[in-house]
Every structure is written in structure tokens, then in C-alpha cells.
Amino acid sequence: MSAVKVQLVPWTEKYRPARIADVVGNEEAKKKYVAWINSWVKGKPSKKAALLYGPPGSGKTSIVHATAKEFSWELIELNASDVRTREALQQRLLGALNTRSVLGYSGKIILLDEVDGISTKEDAGGLQAIVELIEKSNWPIVLTANDPWDPKLRPLRDLCELIEFKKIGKRDIMKVLENICSKEGVECSREVLSAIADNAKGDLRAAINDLQSLAMGKKTISLADLQILGDRAEQETIFDIVRSVLTAKYPEQALAVTRLPSLDYEMLMQWLSENIVYQYEPSLQAIADAYDALSWADIMLTRMKREQQWALLSYALELMTAGVASARERPPFKFVKYSFPEKLRILARSKEKREKFVRAVRGAAAKIHVSTSKFRTDVLPYLRVIYEHDKKRALEILRNLGVPEDALELATQ
């Protein structure tokens, strides 16, 4: 029984750094953060709060956990997007900020995660409450955000030491994965570790989750096993390009993506073909115009290759960018989570199976109020561990999340 409990511990928690020095990468950010922490230790903080910002999995939360362990401070952690009103924040934090730390701790540190998730329209007084808490605090407060430059966060920026965390380098990610494999007794070649690190694209937490998912129930990970991973790297590099084309205010803005040195026009064609309908619905006119332009671009590319008329490439690029963006009656901008093109899937899965899984994840994610990407990286790995040891219990959890009966097995694969 104890062995099962050990296996159920997420590796992101099991191998979380215990000291600030153990936090991987971001050396400049760590220096700035340590200087700020030391100013608190000396009793003369330069700023009462620090705002750590950067992409997911870059170490923002881990460095605060490491600080608490290293200094024997009590960690009071809240997700700001979960406790968003003035009353809720004050109820959870005000008492903690003005009382002594519990027995065994020499101080406190407060972590407010994802402050950019607070909406000024919906979350009455939440941001102002954070400002007031910072001003009254007798303990260091750390805020984290992906985008600190959101106008609504300006009052917080003025009160905080701003510290930027960047994506973790591939070598650093591989070292962490190699160390985990060694401790877990998992055989994994450097080629496989390299592929996992590439796929994570700077997100160390995602890389560790992927490694744990791959290692589940086995002691050796091969390249063939990597097929179950999502195509995170490719998706993130092309999302902005697709969005630039489909949401451009003017055709010239869409055309600008053709000047990107890394543009893969054939991949762009596939992504546009897959996602035009989602971005332009419910306007049938816009959808028809966009696909018409895309079909002409496809004709140009086919003729270019068949007849070796490379001059046609410029026309094809204009059609698939400016042509698509010129669609009539386009609906107002809305955020769309673009789908990876079916044709480019590593595995030849049927479209029906893919869409069933996406709907299941989207529905389950909505039920627990997280994004689908967060559900995939932070929830599914746990469910798969549970499934390994208690299939009946895992399926019961999925049913409670609203996953349809015919998609239960898909969610655990």
C-alpha cells in the first residue's frame, strides 16, 4: 500500500526544489529575487511585494516554495483567480498577515498565484484588496503572473519589485529529467529526453508531467512511446501566426506573417483549413470567402510544385494570408483555442475519436473551472495514475466530471 502512495505523488511535487539555489535556470531573476528576500531578512524591504512574471513552468511558484523551506517560513498560498473578491481575500489573508507565525516557523511568506486572472469587471474590489494587503503587510508577499503588463495590474506594478522569469533552457530541462529518471529507476535515452524537452518548449513542469505519464507502469521509455504526447511545441509556435491571420484588422497585417523566416506555409495552410470555421462562425459569408481564398492558394501551390513555377509562391502566400483576412462579414474578434490539424497528427487517429476526446476534456475542464490545457497537464496525469491502480475509481471520477461513457477510456490513455 505504501508503494502505491509513493507512486501517486506527482513528480512535480516530489522533486520540487528545497532551496532557492536548486531552482533551475533564470540566474538573473534568482539574483534579483534573493536580493529582495534579503532586504526583508534585514528588516528593510525595498518593496513589500515582488511580482514574478513569465511563462508557465519557468519556476515562479517553485522559488517561493523553496524560499519557505530554506528560511523555515510558513507558506500561505492562494490562487488569486480562485479567491477574487475583496471580502474573500481579506477573510483568507488579513488575519494571517497581522499575526505571528505558527510554532516551528520563524516567519511567513505569502504567495498569490495568477493575479492576472482577476477580472476588474467581475471580481469586485479584488485588485484593490491586494493593494491594501500589500501596504499593511508585515511579511513578504509574492505575486505571480504570465502577463504583468495588463493595464489592470498597474496599481500592483507600482508596489512590487518586478522580476522576469524566462522559459527554461533545453539543457536544464534535460538535466532535471535525467536526475528524476535516475532516482525513479527509469531507463530513458538522451534522445528521448531531448524529445520530451523539445516538446515542453521551456515549460519544466510540463516536461516532468510528460515524463511521469510516459513512465507510468514501465521502467523503460522508448521513442515510440512519445507518440502519446501532444504536439505542444509546434502548436505554440504557430498559434500566434494563425491568430494574426484570422484576426487581422487589415489584409496588410495578415500578409506580414509571410516575412517570418521560420514560416512553414504548408503547415499554415493546414492550420488555417482546420480553424477558419471556429474563428469566423457564425458568419457563413466569412467562412465561405476565407475557404475560397485558401482553395485558390492550394491551387497555386499545386501548380507551383507540378510545373516548377516558383514565382507562384508569392501569390499563394498572399491568398492564404491577406486573402483569408479579406473575408466579408467577419464576426467581431473572439478568443478561439485553435485545434491541431487532423492531417498532421502523429498517430492516424480518426477525427471522430479526436473530437470526442477534446469535447470530453473541455467539458471536464469547464466543470472544475480550469482551462483545457491546464486540465491536460495538471489533472490528466493524476487521473492516469489513479487509473493504473484503481480503474473503477478513475472511471467514477471521470463520470462525475461529466465525461461521456464512450470517452471514458480515451481520457485515461
Curated annotation (Swiss-Prot):
Stored SUPFAM superfamilies? P-loop containing nucleoside triphosphate hydrolases
- Molecular function (GO) terms listed? ATP binding; ATP hydrolysis activity; DNA clamp loader activity
Q: Which SMART domains did the record assign?
A: AAA (SM00382)
**What Gene3D superfamilies is this protein classified in?**
1.10.8.60, P-loop containing nucleotide triphosphate hydrolases (3.40.50.300)
List ligand-binding residues for ATP.
54-61
Q: Known HAMAP family for this protein?
A: RfcL
Q: Per its UniProt record, what PANTHER family does this chain match?
A: CHROMOSOME TRANSMISSION FIDELITY FACTOR 18, REPLICATION FACTOR C SUBUNIT 1
Q: Which NCBIfam families match?
A: PRK04195.1-5
The annotated subunit structure for this chain is:
Heteromultimer composed of small subunits (RfcS) and large subunits (RfcL).
Q: Under what name is this protein listed?
A: Replication factor C large subunit
Q: Which organism is it from?
A: Thermofilum pendens (strain DSM 2475 / Hrk 5)
Q: What is the lineage of its organism?
A: Archaea, Thermoproteota, Thermoprotei, Thermofilales, Thermofilaceae
